[in-house]
């Protein structure tokens, strides 16, 4: 398995509870697809440098996780189905040893 980091930008329209439910759902997707979440860093609501989908604010969450490379396309497909997830970026941190 490889080590990845995902940074998520989530709609500011959500309540704190709905925001928590959304990022916990992303964690659940990682685990259901054979991955392991190692660290979750919730940055909270931040002002954006430029509007994204007409929003000037958004919630940020950064997660580090181990994940099988073969499951990455399915994970990205599931992320795209989440309407309140405005943007995400997945970065490979370390290759397999």
From Swiss-Prot:
Species of origin reads: Dictyoglomus turgidum (strain DSM 6724 / Z-1310)
Segments forming a coiled coil: none
Q: Tell me which UniProt keywords the record has, alphabetically.
A: Ribonucleoprotein, Ribosomal protein, RNA-binding, rRNA-binding
Q: What does this protein do?
A: Binds together with bS18 to 16S ribosomal RNA.
Checking NCBIfam families in the record gives: S6
* Protein's name in the database: Small ribosomal subunit protein bS6
Record GO terms (molecular function): small ribosomal subunit rRNA binding; structural constituent of ribosome
A Gene Ontology biological process term: translation
Q: Does the keyword Transferase apply?
A: no
């Amino acid at each position: 398995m490889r080590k990845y980091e995902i940074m998520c930008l989530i709609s500011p329209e959500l309540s704190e509870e709905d925001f928590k439910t959304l990022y916990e759902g992303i964690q659940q997707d990682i685990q259901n697809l054979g991955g392991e979440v190692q660290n979750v860093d919730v940055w909270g609501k931040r002002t954006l440098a430029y509007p994204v989908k007409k929003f000037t604010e958004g919630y940020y969450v950064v997660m580090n996780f181990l994940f099988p490379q073969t499951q990455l396309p399915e994970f990205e497909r599931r992320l795209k189905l989440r309407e309140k997830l405005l943007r995400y970026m997945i970065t490979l941190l370390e290759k397999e040893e």
